[in-house]
């Protein structure tokens, strides 16, 4: 029906994947074939079903090229190549990008073609190494100890640090679910003898930039040893004194790129361990409560508040929770009534930005009907170019440390707390 089509279309345009999930479950039979296939492709991407996503995107483009328009065809084929890369087939990912760039050469704008060529080269480069190799017949699960350490010398906030051996040398890494990639600074990349490449990726923090890919021959964390581990080289302090003060905490980051290699992992705050497991975990939850951004693969949790729901980044790399300008937009009256106005700095790739915020003394929300309360929560009041304060914000390590155990199930796309 046109009603189901309109509702699904609004969700796709607004990146509302949980709402689209519910609409698709209820009304997919009454959707037009194009909207049904478009929805299926985006849901499979958002909920980490990559084989299904590749098939759905191919079917959508093959059958509905005229309907969806050239701009969407380019976006979907670009997403298809990314999906092949996620499935470990960088050769196919590169071939898809090359074919698309060849077709558009001379007809599309040069910036679009250049971006497709950059991605083609990235997949070519990644395809030269068999990434994330493990010993065959090794353990199904691996225990990785962590410690919580102050964010900086004068801070009461903490980060999760993991001891590692990077190319045989001791290296402290920050455990960061909010980082799409494993990240290392240029100085550390040289110190640990990573092999640099000329392939680049786009990175967004307090501003947009690019990082170069480098490969670590070997990384050991806890009982796990991985070979050919990709990192993105980012200059985090970029000459800014205030950033340099805190950039050391992020000079080597273990990100989602590595964590997504495992069907599930458990963060145990009583034992101070992360268990990375190759086993598929059964869950009592039928409906997912985490999703991924189609482009960046950052995990978002569905949170209930004020009679509604919203998706917020799960970010162990943020010492404290911050709520973004979308939260302020939706709950202005609550924030203005309970909050105290302030100016706050946020630090990330790109430097420091200063935001107009309201600070909430306490805030109670729900994760899958489980209530939790956070204290002293800043809400960004203004829309800025800073990606760290955009959308609904990020649940930081203060949220994770409320629980004894947090289980992230990458296969079923659930987060469960106890």
Feature map (PLM): residue ranges:
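Pepsin/retropepsin-fold aspartyl endopeptidases
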Residues: 1-418
């Amino acid at each position: 029906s046109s009603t189901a089509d309109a509702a699904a279309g609004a969700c796709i345009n607004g990146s509302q994947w949980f709402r689209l999930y519910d609409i698709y479950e209820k009304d997919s039979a009454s959707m037009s074939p194009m909207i049904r296939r478009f929805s299926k492709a985006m849901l499979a991407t958002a909920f980490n079903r990559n084989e299904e996503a590749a098939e759905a995107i191919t079917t959508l483009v093959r059958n509905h090229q005229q309907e969806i328009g050239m701009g969407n065809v380019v976006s979907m084929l670009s997403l298809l190549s990314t999906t092949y890369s996620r499935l470990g087939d960088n050769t196919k990912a590169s071939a898809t990008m090359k074919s698309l760039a060849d077709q558009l050469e001379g007809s599309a704008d040069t910036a679009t073609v250049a971006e497709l060529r950059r991605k083609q080269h990235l997949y070519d480069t990644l395809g030269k190494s068999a990434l994330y190799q493990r010993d065959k017949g090794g353990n199904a699960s691996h225990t990785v100890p962590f410690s919580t350490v102050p964010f900086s010398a004068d801070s009461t906030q903490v980060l999760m640090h993991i001891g590692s051996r990077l190319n045989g040398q001791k290296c402290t890494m920050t455990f960061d679910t909010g980082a799409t990639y494993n990240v290392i600074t240029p100085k550390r990349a040289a110190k640990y003898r990573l092999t640099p490449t000329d392939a680049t990726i786009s990175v967004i923090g307090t501003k947009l930039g690019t990082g170069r890919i480098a490969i670590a021959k070997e990384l050991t964390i806890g009982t796990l040893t991985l070979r050919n581990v990709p990192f993105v080289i980012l200059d985090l302090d970029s000459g800014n004194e205030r950033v340099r003060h805190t950039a050391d905490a992020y000079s080597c980051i273990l990100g989602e790129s590595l964590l997504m290699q495992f069907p599930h992992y458990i963060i145990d705050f009583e034992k101070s361990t992360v268990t990375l497991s190759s086993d598929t975990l059964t869950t009592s939850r039928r409906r997912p409560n985490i999703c991924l951004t189609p482009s960046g693969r950052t995990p978002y949790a569905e949170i209930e508040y004020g009679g509604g729901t919203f998706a917020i980044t799960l970010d162990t790399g943020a010492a404290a929770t911050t709520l973004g300008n979308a939260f302020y937009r939706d709950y202005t009256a609550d924030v203005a009534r309970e909050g105290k106005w302030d100016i706050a700095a946020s630090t990330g790739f790109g430097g420091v930005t200063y935001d107009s915020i309201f600070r909430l003394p306490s805030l109670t929300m729900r994760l899958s009907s489980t209530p939790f309360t956070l204290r002293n929560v800043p809400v960004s009041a203004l829309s800025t170019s800073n990606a760290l304060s955009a959308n609904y914000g990020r649940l930081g390590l203060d949220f994770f440390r409320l629980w004894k155990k947090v289980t992230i199930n990458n296969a079923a796309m659930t987060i469960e707390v106890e």
